Amino acid sequence: LPGWRLAVFTGVPEFGKSIGLRSFKQYKLFNGKLPAQLLLFEIQPENARTPRDPAAPGQVMPRIANPERADMLRNRLKKNLKTIGQWARKQNIGCYRLYDADMPEYALAIDIYEGRVHVQEYLAPKSIDEKAARERLAEAMAVIPEVLEVAPENLVCKQRQRQTGTKQYEKQAATGEYFNVHEHGCTLKVNLKDYLDTGLFLDHRPVRHWIQQHARGKRFLNLFCYTGAATVHAAVGGASRSLSLDMSKTYVSWAQDNLALNRADSRKHVVEQADCLAWLADRKTANQTFDLIFMDPPTFSNSARMAGV
């Protein structure tokens, strides 16, 4: 009833998101040795919130089944935050990998995107019990927001699998939740939920920075350009012109958006949908010359033009 108060004592604070109310007080306590929280609510219309749907894309309901094992992950994340996180802050890097299956019990990749967290669970081999794998993932999803001090709505979880055919390009969800991140003076658009990948390959960061440092006055070619992040670095670095090609119309549009975010001249920095291998084999291509070429072909072979994705 309006005006009443509600108290919930839980070892899984994430369950509080399912109540449909915003808590006005949160107390960190213990249930024996288990960390817990006391959540206080006022039943008022203005405190209503949309209950979190555990079946929604990227949602895994957290639960700690083995506190000792969860403590191991908690301590590892704290250690990585102290070392990798400190290094990233000193380098003014906002997007980086914090954890990459450091512990065999938790086969995850945890990436930071300027205050948001992207978690990918590596597909467990058939020898691993599926129930045990789900249990460990639920533990990780309880520990990660606690250690990283991130709101649950800013944490996304996916299962990482080897992609074949056009699956790498297909949508996993349809939230349309894009936001901008920053890297060496460039603004880049990312999406943590809708696709297998986010729009920014973190392991390419040193190469992108090198391109930016060496692009001034150069003609730049980006084959299999994905979202065009390398082209953005080239443009920001002063490339005289660039051509970026990809088979996916989704990523061609994304690359164009990235260039527009950085005020690159679309007449000088062109993005086109094309089969890169066919383009290389075309005799007309021989008349075009470039000073810098970046080529990162996908891990699968697919000769069909992906005109519809």
Where are these regions (language model features)?
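Non-catalytic nucleic-acid substrate-recognition regions in nucleic-acid-modifying enzymes
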Residues: E46-Y113, Q120-E139
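Redox-cofactor binding/interface segments in oxidoreductases and associated redox assembly factors
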Residues: V119, F294-M295
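Non-catalytic substrate-recognition/targeting regions of SAM-dependent transferases
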Residues: C95, Y99-D111, A133-L202, H209
